[in-house]
């Protein structure tokens, strides 16, 4: 609709205005401006009260909407709307329609509904154009007699009026299609109603019709007929003439049968005949072939017609609440049936043909008498099968059985057979007060009503409750009934007693009672006990208040529903006390003294064992006297009965505390939620008052509590980085922490926090903090006061202290066998209880514990008690809920999680409140004596419903010291296993977990084939690595670190990991674990680190499963360790995480068994809060040689990690990944060692140049701090060092011989972590080539093992001596790197900026030291007898000469040549030098043999060739290092001219960016006997002649191994920007002297391999100088 906004000079030709829902109170003025053009005006849903006269000038209106207004008068001017077609004035206050309405001749649609009209004007029938007229709810009492003049009417709505008759002229409305007469007072319909030929819908519901005229059968076009809610007793047979009828609604009438003609309604689709009096359904119903919905609810049908099977289109059949006794087998013909509801009938069996209804999805047979279901129903695809009224789940689990009567296979479940429920006609017949309790009202209610029952059986307490209208609801008790409870508590103190039963019931009455109670039990297993005459009966508790609809559905709920509330179950049968005090059901019950004929109702709950005390144990005579007087009081008087309630074990304050409002337990240390206070509606025995003692209803001795005194303390806490270590609760306006006190209380104290060390305890009331009073403060004020208190917090607290009563009775701790049996009265007027031994089926044993309070407290937590969440469902006792590791309770070893606390320091705790127990435990007493009750192996209590929470989680056997005498500790285990288990140093326990279908809540690690680190490092096994906080294992008392010895008797000490998992997952009703309480890993603790917004965590990790070991001291350890802590991250700021710690869990996610990548991903996904469980890992002091700077573990490329996965074994958690992601990193790592896949037998391969980026190498640690694990390459396979890198610590600068690098097949000793001793000469490699390769100064290649016996012969063609100068010059040219066209890829930062700065500082310092040292050595090493060769020798050569040269002989096993003496000042670089050296050796040690004499001439020539090659290589290296030094001088000079040098550019670079080499890393491919290729480093070409003449300078060591170069190769990612701009920049690295562990089998030189060198020559020829 167009809404016109009147603007200046706007177009006023507006045809439609919509002002609905505009809250208009008057008609807008602008509407009048459009009087010439406006045709549609909608003013509905406003607040118009009148229509002004200008309104009726809108003469062109065709549609007017005025509904939902407050118009009180329709003016006669409405006649002006001559062109009006549609008028809607519904839902106004118009009392009458003006007579002038007749002039609106064009009116076709009129709606006057919802107005207080009482009549229509006489001229109304002149509106002959009217087609749709609505007069609903207008209080019409009669229609105009000439209503037939409205000949064009199509729709006439007259619902909700006061019509009692219809005019005969109604039949003239020949165009009428819809007539609605519902909700009137019609009693008779005119016969002329059948003369409406076009009528399609006729609504006659909610009238007073008692019959329908037969003429209705003439309405041939009628589609819908609704005559529901009338008084029809029968239908006319002519109704079958309605050939087009589809909907026939006959609900709520008095029909007793359906006419036979109903079968003629071939188009009938919906037939509703519910709430009638049908006794049968005609067989003609089967002819309604299109019938899809048939509703026959609430009739008197006893059977269904057999023709029902013809209804092939029937989808919904509802026959609820009838008297059906059998279902016709023909129902299987309803193939389209999807919903079949047969609820509340009398069906005893279902026909198997029902399975033919293939589309059946919902079957409701609740409230019948079915014994079983036909097995054929399994063929149906049922979505819901309802067997009971309150069935919790739509589908159940069925079992197959054989029918005892027919022998056929049937389906059954726990809801079958069904219990019959009374029919509805019995609902009004209430039982009289004298009838049995089984005749309870039948209507199901949501509460248990305490109503009139047998007077002789009704307690006074229950009578009082009934008079007050008390309704007992499901536990927990609603808070709104607390006030009502106080009234009952007052009546308890008046010692109401029960009236004795005047006469015992007859056996027939007993049978009725038992049968009624059996019906109430709803599916429980019947007991075999029978009632015997003359013996007192104990009837089920509170049956009076339980309707018969209540118990069975409740049982169904608890069995099927996933969540089960704590329930109270009722005893099904009478419990007959026997002589030994045990009931027929096998549960120990007290044989209480019941008067003759007295019948008691016992509430059967979770079995509890009576805490009786023996008379012999009472230490004081007044306690004995009080006990005897209490018994006499019970027996006094002719009507003395047995009292029914528990005695409150507290002094006068007990009632006040029980009547307190529901309070919320805010003690976070116990971790228990809130619940309402437990309630027992039983009377209290009025025992005489004896100071110090009292009694409960069974005359059990109860010790009164100690007196509570309050003291004020002033404590000072020094705040630390982690806070104060306390939590507070309460405050003004908050939920009180204790009672009604709105003060601030300490709710939690961290065990090792500053507050605990200062003496703060849980329960202290906070009065003042640093002078700020907190008595009436709100919670947030207290929080702000604590936060702003500064470093030293001085607080004033109020603490409660227990003072023992004057005549307190102290109880001797009971031994486990001193459990108490029920008492019986024998002899005369007063009989003492007979003490009998406990029955052998006892599930519990008692033991005493005495704990000495430490500075950290007692070390355990309690849960349960009144006023707190029950630790176990339905059990209000106090239990040990947690034992702190290392606390007093843990060290004592006498407490276990789940132990019930019976008394604390002699004060009974069986019915105590939670806060009382806390007060006793936090008292000032240094020692605490506990009497505990522990569940032991044996029969279990009645199993709770599945998934009930929480349940008694396990039955934990006591340790040997507290076991029951004469009872085997672990009966399921073999004696050998038990003996072996008990021999260990740690306690062994058997823990049983009831399997209820849910998870165990634990994870294991270890096994004979898996590492179990950090558990059992020295003694591997299967360990519990994770326990879910509230899982089944945690409730059983299992802890992290427990060693599993056996699972259900199966020994798993030597089992594999998978076998242990299979044993734990094996289906069984109960899982019994034999565990040994091994101590947890040392240093295990949980740390919480908070990250600031945008702050990085700042740690790096190493290790992981299926990768490189993160523990350098143990290569088998697959744990995750912290390898670096950045001082700028959150971890460095926190200060508790340090290098070497092992990570066990991150945010409750275990890291055990995760790969390195998974651990990195998990750590990177944490939010702002990191909760990490750590323990001690490796000692960083033993791996100091691996560190390049403080707090940084050495780079894996330099730390002897020589594995392909070295790159993947250390990751920074805060590293920004490249766009390529981890896949790119893995690709780089996978390309690191391509030479491994090459054949070692390929010869003549060119060693292509290796391009090393200067920046990448300069960022690596210097050789002075470089640790290289010794490695030997054999046959193309890299072998690991025989010992850990940390075991090789020698002076920097000394090149270790090859003796430390052993192949795996060598006899070198391999000990874990042991020192690597130098080998003996016999253990040296036999191959001469291998020996020389170990010390060659040029990089060589390793021949395969099968070439050991083939010494190389010099090839003359390839000899460097035969090459020209220019050909030799090519070896010394540096290759110019051509920049790549494409842009550099994204760098991956491997070294942080702070680490790079530390490396550079350390490098500069070491270079300074080396320069000074070399200058000093140069003067010493120069001598006159050096000759020409010595002129070129440098201190580097002397260092090499100082090494013990081992020259092994041929494979024959000859001893190596003697090494030169240490400290010799003549390096062996020439033949003359060697002769001089040998002369000195002969002079010093004449007995040394000459190994060369044993060599053949060919071998001697080969050896000489090797020596010469070695010497030439040393000279070439000296020249090359001089050239490098010169280049550095040039770079320094350029730096003075404003250009930056490589070191400065490296320092400014954010991270070392390795440069990718265009050549594959096949430079180090293993070849049979290829010449050593020179490895040119990328840079610009420099002519050898340009720098060969430069003066010799201090050389730079560059001793590396091929695998080291290979690792460096993986660093290459992109050329550094500007790296090619500088003159003289070469890709070299200043590595200083090698580390002790850096045994380089070859040296990397600066030579270029431009051509193949023939095999057999190991070096270069002499270079002309």
Curated annotation (Swiss-Prot):
Residues with the modification Phosphothreonine, per the entry, are: 378, 475, 674-675, 812, 1353, 1555
Q: Which GO terms describe its biological process?
A: activation of GTPase activity; apoptotic process involved in morphogenesis; astrocyte cell migration; auditory receptor cell morphogenesis; auditory receptor cell stereocilium organization; camera-type eye morphogenesis; cell migration; cell population proliferation
What's its membrane topology?
A: Peripheral membrane protein
- LRR repeat residue intervals: 37-58, 60-81, 83-104, 106-127, 129-150, 152-174, 175-197, 198-219, 221-243, 244-265, 267-288, 290-312, 313-334, 336-357, 359-381, 382-402
The answer, when asked if Coiled coil is one of the entry's keywords, is yes
What residue spans carry the region label Interaction with ARHGEF7? 703-1215
Q: Let me know which tissues express this protein, per UniProt.
A: Expressed in CD4+ T-cells (at protein level). Found in a wide range of tissues including liver, kidney and spleen. Also expressed in the brain (at protein level).
| Stretches the record annotates as Required for interaction with VIM | 714-1180
| Subcellular location(s) per record | Cell membrane; Cell junction; Cell junction, Adherens junction; Cell projection, Lamellipodium
Assembly and partners are described as: Interacts with UBE3A. Interacts with PAK1 and PAK2. Interacts (via PDZ domains) with VANGL2. Interacts (via PDZ domains) with LPP and TRIP6; the interaction is direct. Interacts (via PDZ domains) with TJP2. Interacts (via PDZ domains) with APC; may mediate APC targeting to adherens junctions of epithelial cells. Interacts (via PDZ domains) with TSHR; regulates TSHR trafficking and function. Interacts with ARHGEF7 and GIT1; interacts directly with ARHGEF7. Interacts with CTNNB1. Interacts with MAPK12. Interacts (via PDZ domains 1 and 3) with MCC. Interacts with DLG5.
Official protein name in the record: Protein scribble homolog
């Amino acid at each position: 609709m167009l809404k016109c906004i009147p603007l200046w000079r706007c177009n006023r030709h507006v045809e439609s205005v919509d002002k609905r829902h505009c809250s208009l109170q008057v008609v807008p003025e602008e509407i009048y401006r459009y009087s010439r053009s406006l045709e549609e005006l909608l003013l509905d849903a406003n607040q118009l009260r009148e229509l002004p006269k200008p309104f009726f000038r809108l003469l062109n209106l065709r549609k007017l909407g005025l509904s939902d207004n407050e118009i009180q008068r329709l003016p006669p001017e409405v006649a002006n709307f001559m062109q009006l077609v549609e008028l809607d004035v519904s839902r106004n206050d118009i009392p009458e329609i003006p007579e002038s309405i007749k002039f609106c001749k064009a009116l076709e649609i009129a709606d006057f509904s919802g107005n207080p009209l009482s009549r229509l004007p006489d001229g109304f029938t002149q509106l002959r154009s009217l087609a749709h007229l609505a007069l609903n709810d207008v209080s019409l009492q009669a229609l105009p007699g000439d209503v037939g003049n409205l000949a064009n009417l199509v729709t006439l709505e007259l619902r909700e009026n006061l019509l009692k008759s219809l005019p005969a002229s109604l039949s003239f409305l020949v165009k009428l299609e819809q007539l609605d007469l519902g909700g009137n007072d019609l009693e008779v319909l005119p016969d002329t109603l059948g003369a409406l030929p076009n009528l399609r819908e006729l609504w006659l519901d909610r009238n007073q019709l008692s019959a329908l005229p037969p003429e209705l059968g003439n309405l041939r076009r009628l589609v819908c007929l609704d005559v529901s809610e009338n008084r029809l007793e029968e239908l006319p047979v002519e109704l079958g003439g309605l050939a087009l009828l589809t909907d026939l609604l006959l609900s709520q009438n008095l029909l007793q049968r359906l006419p036979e003609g109903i079968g003629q309604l071939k188009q009938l689709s919906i037939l509703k005949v519910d709430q009638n009096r049908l006794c049968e359904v005609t067989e003609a119903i089967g002819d309604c072939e299109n019938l899809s919905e048939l509703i026959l609810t609430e009739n008197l049908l006893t059977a269904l017609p057999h023709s029902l099977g013809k209804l092939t289109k029937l989808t919904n059949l509802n026959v609820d609440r009838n008297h059906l006794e059998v279902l016709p087998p023909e129902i299987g013909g309803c193939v389209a049936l999807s919903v079949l509801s047969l609820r509340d009938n009398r069906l005893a069996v279902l026909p198997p043909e029902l399975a033919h209804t293939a589309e059946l999805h919902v079957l409701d047979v609740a409230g019948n008498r079915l014994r079983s279901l036909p097995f054929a129903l399994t063929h149906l695809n049922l979505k819901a099968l309802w067997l009971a009224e309150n069935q919790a789940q739509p589908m159940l689990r069925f079992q197959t059985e054989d029918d005892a009567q027919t022998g056929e296979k049937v389906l059954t479940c726990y809801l079958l057979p069904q219990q019959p429920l009374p029919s509805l006609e019995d609902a009004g017949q209430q039982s009289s007060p004298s009838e049995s309790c089984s005749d309870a009202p039948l209507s199901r209610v949501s509460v248990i009503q305490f109503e009139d029952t047998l007077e002789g059986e009704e307690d006074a307490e229950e009578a009082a409750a009934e008079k007050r209208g008390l309704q007992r609801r499901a536990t927990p008790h609603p808070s709104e009934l607390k006030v009502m409870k106080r009234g009952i508590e007052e009546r308890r103190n008046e010692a109401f007693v029960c009236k004795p039963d005047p006469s015992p019931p007859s056996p027939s009455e007993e049978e009725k009672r038992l049968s009624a109670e059996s019906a109430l039990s709803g599916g429980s297993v019947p007991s075999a006990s029978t009632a015997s005459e003359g013996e007192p009966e104990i009837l089920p508790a509170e049956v009076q208040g339980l309707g018969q609809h209540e118990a069975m559905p409740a049982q169904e709920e608890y069995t099927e529903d996933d969540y089960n509330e704590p329930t109270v179950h009722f005893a099904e049968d009478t419990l007959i006390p026997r002589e030994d005090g045990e009931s027929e059901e096998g549960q120990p019950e007290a044989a209480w003294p019941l008067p003759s004929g007295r019948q008691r109702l016992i509430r059967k709950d979770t079995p509890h064992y009576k805490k009786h005390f023996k008379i012999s144990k009472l230490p004081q005579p007044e306690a004995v006297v009080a006990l005897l007087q209490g018994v006499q009081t019970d027996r006094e008087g002719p009507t003395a009965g047995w009292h029914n309630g528990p005695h409150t074990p507290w002094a006068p304050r007990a009632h006040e505390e029980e009547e307190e409002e529901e309070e919320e337990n805010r003690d976070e240390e116990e971790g228990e939620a809130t619940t309402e206070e437990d309630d027992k509606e039983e009377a209290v025995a009025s025992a005489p008052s004896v100071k110090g003692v009292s009694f409960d209803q069974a005359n059990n001795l109860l010790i009164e509590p100690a007196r509570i005194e309050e003291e004020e303390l002033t404590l000072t806490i020094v705040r630390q980085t982690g806070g104060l270590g306390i939590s507070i609760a309460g405050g003004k306006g908050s939920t009180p922490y204790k009672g009604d006190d709105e003060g601030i209380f300490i709710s939690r104290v961290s065990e090792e926090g500053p507050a605990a060390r200062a003496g703060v305890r849980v329960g202290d009331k906070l009065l003042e903090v640093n002078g700020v009073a907190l008595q009436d403060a709100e919670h947030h004020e207290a929080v702000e006061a604590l936060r702003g208190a500064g470093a030293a917090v001085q607080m004033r607290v109020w603490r409660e202290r227990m003072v023992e009563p004057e005549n307190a009775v102290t109880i001797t701790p009971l031994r486990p066998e001193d459990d108490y049996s029920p008492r019986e009265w024998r002899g005369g007027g007063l009989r003492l209880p007979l003490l009998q031994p406990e029955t052998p089926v006892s599930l519990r044993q008692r033991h005493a514990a005495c704990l000495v309070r430490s500075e950290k407290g007692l070390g355990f937590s309690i849960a349960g008690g009144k006023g707190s969440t029950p630790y176990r469902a339905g059990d209000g006792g106090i239990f040990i809920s947690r034992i702190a590791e290392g606390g007093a309770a843990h060290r004592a070893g006498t407490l276990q999680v789940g132990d019930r606390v019976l008394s604390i320091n002699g004060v009974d705790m069986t019915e105590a409140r939670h806060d009382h127990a806390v007060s006793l435990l936090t008292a000032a007493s240094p020692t605490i004596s506990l009497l505990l009750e522990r569940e032991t192996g044996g029969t279990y209590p009645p199993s709770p419903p599945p998934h009930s929470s929480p349940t008694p989680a396990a039955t934990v056997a006591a340790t040997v010291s507290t076991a029951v005498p004469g009872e085997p500790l672990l009966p399921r285990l073999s004696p050998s296993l038990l003996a072996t288990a008990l021999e260990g140093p740690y306690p062994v326990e058997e823990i049983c977990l009831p399997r209820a279908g849910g998870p165990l809540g634990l994870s294991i690690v270890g096994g004979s084939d898996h590492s179990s680190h950090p558990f059992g490092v020295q003694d591997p096994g299967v360990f519990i690595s994770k326990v879910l906080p509230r899982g089944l294992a945690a409730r059983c008392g299992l802890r992290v670190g427990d060693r599993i010895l056996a699972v259900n008797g199966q020994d798993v000490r030597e089992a594999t990991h998978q076998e242990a998992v299979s044993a734990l997952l094996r289906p069984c009703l109960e899982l019994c674990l034999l565990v040994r309480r091994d101590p947890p890993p040392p240093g295990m603790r949980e740390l919480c680190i908070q990250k600031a917004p945008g702050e990085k965590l700042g740690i790096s990790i190493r290790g992981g499963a299926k990768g490189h070991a993160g523990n350098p001291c143990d290569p088998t350890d697959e744990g995750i360790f912290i390898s670096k802590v950045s001082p700028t991250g959150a971890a460095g700021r926190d200060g508790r995480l340090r290098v070497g710690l092992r990570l066990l869990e991150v945010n409750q996610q275990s890291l055990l068994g995760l790969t390195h990548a998974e651990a990195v991903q998990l750590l990177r996904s944490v939010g702002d809060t990191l909760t990490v469980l750590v323990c001690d890992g490796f000692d960083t002091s033993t791996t100091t040689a691996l560190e390049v700077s403080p707090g940084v573990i050495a780079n894996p490329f330099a730390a002897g990690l020589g594995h392909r996965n070295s790159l993947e074994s250390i990751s920074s958690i805060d590293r920004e990944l490249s766009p390529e992601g981890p896949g790119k990193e893995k690709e780089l790592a996978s390309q690191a060692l391509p030479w491994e896949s090459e054949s070692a037998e390929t010869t003549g391969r060119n060693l292509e140049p290796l391009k090393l980026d200067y920046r990448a190498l300069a960022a690596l640690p210097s050789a002075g701090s470089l640790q290289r694990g010794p490695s030997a390459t054999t046959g193309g396979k890299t072998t690991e060092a025989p010992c850990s890198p940390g075991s090789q610590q020698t002076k920097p600068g000394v090149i270790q011989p090859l003796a430390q690098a052993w192949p795996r097949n060598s006899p070198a000793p391999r000990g874990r972590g042991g020192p690597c001793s130098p080998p003996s000469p016999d253990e040296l490699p036999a191959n001469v080539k291998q020996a020389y390769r170990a010390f060659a100064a040029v990089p060589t290649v390793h021949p395969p093992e099968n070439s050991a016996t083939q010494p190389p012969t010099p090839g003359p063609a390839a000899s460097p001596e035969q090459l020209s100068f220019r050909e030799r010059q090519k070896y010394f040219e540096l290759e110019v790197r051509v920049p790549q066209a494409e842009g550099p890829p994204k760098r991956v930062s491997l070294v942080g900026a702070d680490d790079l700065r530390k490396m550079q500082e350390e490098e500069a310092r070491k270079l300074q030291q080396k320069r000074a040292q070399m200058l000093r050595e140069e003067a010493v090493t120069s001598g006159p007898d050096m000759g020409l060769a010595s002129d070129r020798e440098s201190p580097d050569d002397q260092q090499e000469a100082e090494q013990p040269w081992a020259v092994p002989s041929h494979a024959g096993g000859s001893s190596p040549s003697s090494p030169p003496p240490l400290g010799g000042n003549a390096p062996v670089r020439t033949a003359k030098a060697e002769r001089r050296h040998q002369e000195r050796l002969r002079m010093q040690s004449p007995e040394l043999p000459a190994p060369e004499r044993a060599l053949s001439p060919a071998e001697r020539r080969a050896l000489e060739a090797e020596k010469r090659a070695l010497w030439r290589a040393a000279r070439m290296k000296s020249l090359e290092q001089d050239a490098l030094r010169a280049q550095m001088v040039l770079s320094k000079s350029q730096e003075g001219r404003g250009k930056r040098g490589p070191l400065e550019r490296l320092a400014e670079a954010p991270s070392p960016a390795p440069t990718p080499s265009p050549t594959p890393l096949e430079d180090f491919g293993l070849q049979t006997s290829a010449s050593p290729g020179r490895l040119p480093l990328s840079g610009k070409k420099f002519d050898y002649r340009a720098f060969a003449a430069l003066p010799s300078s201090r050389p730079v060591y560059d001793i590396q191994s091929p695998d080291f170069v290979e690792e460096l190769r993986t660093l290459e990612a992109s050329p550094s920007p500007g790296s090619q701009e500088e003159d003289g920049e070469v890709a070299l690295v200043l590595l200083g002297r090698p580390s002790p562990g850096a045994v380089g089998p070859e040296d990397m030189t600066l030579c270029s391999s431009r051509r193949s060198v023939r095999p057999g020559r190991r070096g270069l020829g002499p270079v002309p100088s």
